[in-house]
Amino acid sequence: MHFRLFITMFAALSGTVATVFSQTSDETEWENVLETLLSDEDLSSDAREELSFMYESMHESPLNINTATREELSQLPFLTFKQIEDIHAYIYMHGPMLSLGELQLTGNLDYETRKMLRLFVYAGDVPVKRQKLRLAEVLRDGHNEIVGRMDIPLYLRDGYRYHSPEELERYPNRAYLGNRLSHSIRYSFNWHNRIRFGISADKDAGEPFFKRNCTGYDFWSPYLYVKDIGLIKELAIGNFKVQFGYGLLLGGGFSIGKSMALSSIDRNNQGLKPHSSTQEYGYLRGAGVAFGRGHTTFTMLASYTPIDATLKGDTVIGSFKEDGFHRTELEWSKKNNTSLRTIATNVRYSYRGLRYGVTFLAEKLSLPYKGHGGFMGFSTDFSLHRPRYALAAEFSVLDGNVAVLASQTFRFQNGWTMNSVFRSYSPDYMSLHTNAMAEGSVQNETGLLMGLTHDSRNLKMSGYIDLFMHPEPKYGASERSNGMDLRAEADWKLGRRDNLYATARFKSKQKDCSYTGQLEYCITGRYRLRWTHNCRNGAELKTQLYYARYDFIAEPISNGWTLTQSYSKSFLNDCLDIDVTAAAFYTDTYDSRISVYESGLRYSYNFISLYGKGTRIAATIRCNLGRGLQLSLKAGGICYLDRDEISSAQQRIASNHKEDISVQFISKF
């Protein structure tokens, strides 16, 4: 006992010394981790926003490291299965952790991984037995949070200008139905991550507020989620998401990128989850329940979800509208004009690293889409985890079309890890809920992704090569096509205060060329170099250089450069945080655009796309007012040097610059 106490005190002291030397504020550290988790270039803007919200929620409601299950820890993509097993083995052998400093005693957690993990877990007490539900205790001990946000543009788009009645009668879509303000409000309740309920509401810029409906906001998302109550393992009512297998049949609503697929495709979070964000697509509205007994879990769900669509002749769905905008008469006419009925069941068995599941799905659209009035299918999946290797696969059949996904991971003693992912999707395979990894969409594709990772004390290296083929014609390629994708990254820790990070990506894929009348290879390259320095006064300086190149035989070569400088500092004992980012960009065309991460407000998407020639500056101030209150302000502006106006149609701004302000208020009680 005395030896354990000594080791615990030593570990806690070591962690404290490391924190003192790093001198980085919690807010700055969190922004750095969030940027790392969202750095996969293949992620769409919707996927980044959804993942950002998920990680923010996990950060605000951390897990108790002493009671967290493998499934809960597997939601963190930077943790390997071996590291999760080592954490559980340490707790089993030595008892509950008294502090997070003991993480360094588990054997396989390096300093950077421990630093990231600290933002999502805490070392808490282990109850002798699971707490019984008592309404008074739930309401007393639960955590409430209210988040309000407003975005205020300091410019005027053409859609908000005055249009005469005669003009609107002839061109009704030239004017937006609402004002230019965008705002949202969210309330959430959380009791030990076992009972969660809340509601989110959102209005995008240009959408009407109390003009077209009596509810005010354009989108509402109510939800109730209950976990581990008797035989009920999970219960979701309202808006929720579901993930079974590895995303071929029923996924979480967004596509994962290749880097994320290599690290986490074999441990995607399974089951039901509440949809608490303001994303207006990719969720189900109804109810789902999972019953668990022993190693077996049975899940069933039913939903009726209104969706937006572009119709052909009011009788056939031409395409689904996923942006959630309802600003003009035309966009408003597409609001909830279609519906989707969904029934699904899943049975999965888990025991000592082995998991096997079977899923059945039946769906019915209110209008036919591509000749389908509905979909019926099933999938079967399995995974096997061992300390040195992992295997996973899913086989799905939907209306007679087949999709297959298989992955393997091998971990070697010298710090090297080898991953591979094979996928084969039929040309006509189509699931409305897939989030499986793909070069394009989850259909008409066969590919093999192979990756290699090496971790050492001060250097992390990783890379992959993806060889893919589209056996049938697709958009942009009128016949069978193929391609290759290469990516490499390295992260060097240069002493206690400096870090150097570099990425390089090369992609070559075939597409139609009007110049030669046949398929030609389009070659793109994207490179990034980042230097981070932690100053002695607690500030952080971050300098980044980006370069992009686009080369296609029928078009001039397009180059793009961006240089950014960021400064972060905390004042008044972390009561005030300031982040400033300045960028200068020079790109020839949109094809050589560059995506840059900015520090921003909580629960928000903080990547911006820069193209053209100009400068960008943004500043974020967060003030902790005490008693769970936080007020944040972000101001940003961009100035173009190569144009006199920005965008076109209703989005046109009659100026070469635009500025905006965002305000956020958070109350926790």
Which functions belong to the PLM regions below?
Residues 26-33, 111-115, 119, 123-146, ...:
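Outer-membrane beta-barrel biogenesis signature
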Residues 21-62, 127-141:
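N-terminal, intrinsically disordered low-complexity tails/presequences enriched in Lys/Ser/Pro
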Residues 214-307, 412, 417-432, 575-589:
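Outer membrane beta-barrel
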Residues 48-98, 117-122, 203:
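Amphipathic, charged-and-aliphatic alpha-helical interface segments
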Residues 202-219, 273-280, 396-398, 548-555:
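Outer-membrane beta-barrel proteins
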Residues 134-171, 189, 193-199, 235, ...:
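Transmembrane beta-strand segments of Gram-negative outer membrane beta-barrel proteins
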Residues 1-26, 669:
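Bacterial Sec-dependent N-terminal signal peptides
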Residues 176-180, 284, 302, 338-669:
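Exposed, low-structure sequence patches enriched in small/polar residues
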